[in-house]
Amino acid sequence: MKIYKDIITGDEMFADTYKMKLVDDVIYEVYGKLITRQGDDIKLEGANASAEEADEGTDITSESGVDVVLNHRLTECFAFGDKKSYTLYLKDYMKKVLAKLEEKSPDQVDIFKTNMNKAMKDILGRFKELQFFTGESMDCDGMVALVEYREINGDSVPVLMFFKHGLEEEKC
């Protein structure tokens, strides 16, 4: 299994256990599912249940959301109220990624520059339909993943988008 981590923050963003596709050699699209998890209170083994207070069965907790977001502890980010603020973030973030690429993978620089401009225009064109998520550290200097809901075979499917060159693969 491969874990994909943000090259700036080191946050775990997703794993290759999900259906995914590489678009224009710069964006990973990861297909998620809406899920609800339920968990009970922790019970100590060997405890005498009759000596405890009566359990009313109402202590079940649940969390709902996109499986990729929940499993990798991504946090929704509300920092981008308009296209202009997101564009400023993208330009700054892309400079950081470009500096890392020039240092570690100079052969990828031209691919990144050429294809990223097209991808950015496409993303900015759909800005109002997107949700934004940071890694567990909630550091907006790192990668901000995008979530868009798309109609696929009659279902609304959450599709997460991650910038390929802003990730490092780690084999587990």
UniProtKB/Swiss-Prot annotation:
Q: Which residues cross the membrane?
A: none
Q: Which GO terms describe its biological process?
A: cellular response to gamma radiation; double-strand break repair; mitotic G2 DNA damage checkpoint signaling; mitotic intra-S DNA damage checkpoint signaling; positive regulation of cell size; positive regulation of multicellular organism growth; regulation of stem cell differentiation
Chain ranges of the TCTP domain:
1-172
Q: Which domain of life is it from?
A: Eukaryota
Q: Which residues carry this modification: Phosphothreonine?
A: 58, 61
What keywords is this UniProt entry annotated with?
Answer: Calcium, Cytoplasm, Phosphoprotein
* Location in the cell: Cytoplasm
**Pfam family, any one:** TCTP
Under Gene Ontology molecular function, one entry of this record is: guanyl-nucleotide exchange factor activity
Where is it mostly found?
Answer: cytoplasm
Residue(s) carrying Phosphoserine = 50
Entry GO terms, CC: cytoplasm; cytoplasmic microtubule; nucleus; polytene chromosome
Alphabetical list of InterPro entries matching this protein: Mss4-like_sf (IPR011057), Mss4/transl-control_tumour (IPR011323), TCTP (IPR034737), Translation_control_tumour_CS (IPR018103), Translational_control_tumour_p (IPR018105)
What role does it play?
A: Involved in calcium binding and microtubule stabilization.
What the record says about family reads: Belongs to the TCTP family.
Q: What is this protein called?
A: Translationally-controlled tumor protein homolog
Native species of this protein? Drosophila melanogaster
Give the encoding gene's name: Tctp
